[in-house]
């Protein structure tokens, strides 16, 4: 009787446990990036900071993530998923705790940069581990679902920050150290997780891999019938043997998607103000509604990505979001009702974050096991550079050229994403990792 492959096993509690480990990374990332925004608003009472220093504190984490994604992904393929998961979370907990004790802004900038390195490292670890344990039929939903926890972590950070504000002077210290709690809980949980059998096979450690598979799924289950040879990791492999095309595709679609996501999400109150909605309640209520639908848009995408596949759930949202932003550019010239503008932004938000789930799907399906972390880490790095650039230049363009031109530029970027995805996006629905990495 032929043994079953682990990717053919039905969804079970073990898969959801791995999902919790992986999505915890996304939650911590969102929380860390959100809480610094609240903390910065109250730090001025302790430190007399220049605009440059405030900018460095805000961008420090993103800067660290650029390095963390590149270096962390490579070491994830060298040292293993479990070992890197634990080391990374331990360092992240230490750096987060040390924020409480800083005596000047420069120390905090250094710590935020180190936190960014740790967060950037966690992306390829989480994506690799989830993809290598997930059943083929549910891999897209499980990987895409990780993205939802970024928004949850971000939202909770604002809630915690709000409740800590009454502590007054020094409340920012408690805000920043509050991020250590989920990190410690995640670290303790990860101590008992198994190593990826796919990674062990690539190291030639077949006996360990089979022992883990049998312990988790029982007798009669193997890692794979085909993937049995050991293979060493090299950074240049993601640019060779046809993988360069995949690296370009993932880096490009991911970058084009997050450039508008981060820029519009960060400056939505200012955008609504330029549409003529200067009333504070309108601006901030509108911002809250739009950001809420950023989260809501993920959930239908997790169903659709498994029912209809990866290609249509990436290609058509690119087109729909481009049309939505182009429409906003046209409408900015007239006097359009508030509710109508908000509805178009909601359409943009739902489809934008829906296709954003592919940030966690394609990078960890299209690269083979020996460079899966490297490929995921490299593309994470490129996307973070793109998001930092767009977040920096967006307000400059908005102030100098107005909301209409700004929306047209954003729509043009999304249209490029539509064209590239239409020509390059592969279909990996229901494929095992061997098949997805070979198309």
What kind of feature is each model-predicted range?
Residues 1-439:
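Transmembrane-helix signature of 12-pass secondary carriers
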């Amino acid at each position: 009787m032929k043994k079953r492959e682990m990717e053919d096993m039905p969804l079970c509690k073990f898969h959801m446990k791995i999902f919790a480990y992986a999505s915890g990374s996304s939650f911590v990332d969102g929380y860390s990036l959100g809480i610094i925004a609240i903390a910065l608003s109250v730090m001025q009472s302790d430190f007399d900071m220049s605009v440059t220093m405030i900018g460095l504190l805000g961008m420090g984490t993103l800067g660290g993530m650029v390095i963390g994604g590149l270096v962390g992904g490579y070491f994830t393929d060298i040292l293993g998923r479990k070992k890197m998961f634990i080391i990374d979370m331990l360092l992240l907990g230490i750096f987060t705790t040390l924020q409480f004790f800083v005596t000047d802004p420069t120390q905090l900038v250094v710590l935020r940069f180190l936190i960014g390195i740790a967060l950037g490292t966690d992306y390829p670890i989480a994506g690799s581990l989830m993809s290598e344990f997930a059943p083929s039929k549910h891999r897209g939903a499980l990987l895409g679902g990780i993205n939802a926890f970024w928004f949850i972590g971000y939202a909770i950070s604002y809630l915690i920050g709000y409740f800590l504000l009454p502590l007054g002077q020094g409340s920012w210290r408690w805000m920043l150290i509050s991020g250590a709690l989920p990190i410690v809980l995640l670290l303790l949980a990860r101590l008992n997780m198994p190593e990826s059998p796919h990674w062990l096979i690539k190291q030639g450690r077949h006996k360990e891999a089979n022992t883990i598979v049998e312990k988790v799924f029982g007798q009669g289950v193997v890692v794979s019938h085909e993937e049995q040879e050991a293979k060493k990791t090299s950074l240049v492999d993601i640019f060779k043997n046809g993988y360069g095309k995949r690296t370009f595709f993932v880096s490009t679609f991911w970058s084009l998607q997050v450039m508008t996501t981060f820029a519009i999400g960060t400056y939505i109150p200012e955008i609504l103000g330029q549409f003529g909605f200067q009333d504070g309640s309108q601006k901030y209520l509108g911002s809250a509604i739009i950001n809420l639908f950023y989260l809501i848009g993920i959930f239908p995408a997790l169903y659709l990505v498994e029912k209809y596949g990866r290609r249509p759930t990436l290609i058509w949202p690119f087109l729909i979001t481009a049309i939505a932003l182009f429409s906003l550019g046209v409408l900015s010239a007239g006097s359009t009702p508030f509710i109508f503008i908000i509805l178009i932004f909601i359409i943009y938000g739902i489809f934008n974050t829906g296709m954003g789930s592919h940030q966690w799907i394609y990078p960890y399906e299209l690269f083979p096991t020996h460079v899966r972390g490297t490929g995921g880490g490299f593309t994470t790095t490129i996307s973070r550079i793109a998001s930092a650039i767009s977040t920096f230049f967006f307000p400059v363009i908005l102030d100098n050229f107005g909301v209409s031109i700004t929306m047209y530029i954003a729509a043009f970027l999304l249209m490029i994403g539509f064209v590239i995805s239409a020509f390059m996006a592969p279909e990996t629905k229901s494929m095992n990792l061997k098949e997805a990495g070979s198309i």
